[in-house]
Structures are given as structure tokens and as C-alpha cells.
Swiss-Prot record:
Protein name, entry field: Large ribosomal subunit protein uL24c
Keywords: Chloroplast, Plastid, Ribonucleoprotein, Ribosomal protein, RNA-binding, rRNA-binding
Pfam families assigned: KOW, ribosomal_L24
Organism for this UniProt entry: Thalassiosira pseudonana
Gene Ontology MF terms in the entry: rRNA binding; structural constituent of ribosome
Length: 77
């Protein structure tokens, strides 16, 4: 199993996004994925998942969730 990487952010740190769609937005680190080097920032990088209905009486839906971003795309504030 690969060893986790040392990252420059910790859970609870306030960070600013420096690249991507959410550039210049700020948020708090809520989770760290050390094996991939990605972090989850509260209120940043929302993605949508479309779910088809399973039966005719069922209704499809669109779920919104926060996706992780690479730690190199943020800086501490």
C-alpha cells in the first residue's frame, strides 16, 4: 500500500482556490485524501449526478455534491 503524502494543508484550514472554475473563492478544508493528494473544500467544486428512474412510477433526480480538488490548486489564507 502506498504511503500517504505530506500536504501543506490540514483539516479545518481556510484556503483560497488559485486555479480552476472556482478561482479566488475561499472555503474550509473538510477532508483530505492523502493517497491521491486531493482535498475536499466546503462550498467549492460542486458537481451534479443525474440518476435515472428505476421503475415507471419512480422519478429521476439530480444530486449535487462537492468533489475533491488537488492540493496544488489551493493556498492557505
Amino acid at each position: 500500500m502506498p504511503k500517504g503524502k505530506n500536504l501543506h494543508v490540514k483539516i479545518g484550514d481556510n484556503v483560497k482556490i488559485i486555479s480552476g472554475f472556482d478561482k479566488n473563492k475561499t472555503g474550509e478544508v473538510t477532508k483530505i485524501y492523502r493517497n491521491t493528494g486531493k482535498i475536499l473544500v466546503k462550498g467549492i467544486n460542486f458537481k451534479f449526478k443525474h440518476i435515472k428512474p428505476n421503475t415507471e412510477s419512480d422519478v429521476g433526480e439530480i444530486k449535487q455534491f462537492e468533489a475533491p480538488i488537488h492540493h496544488s490548486n489551493v493556498k492557505l489564507i
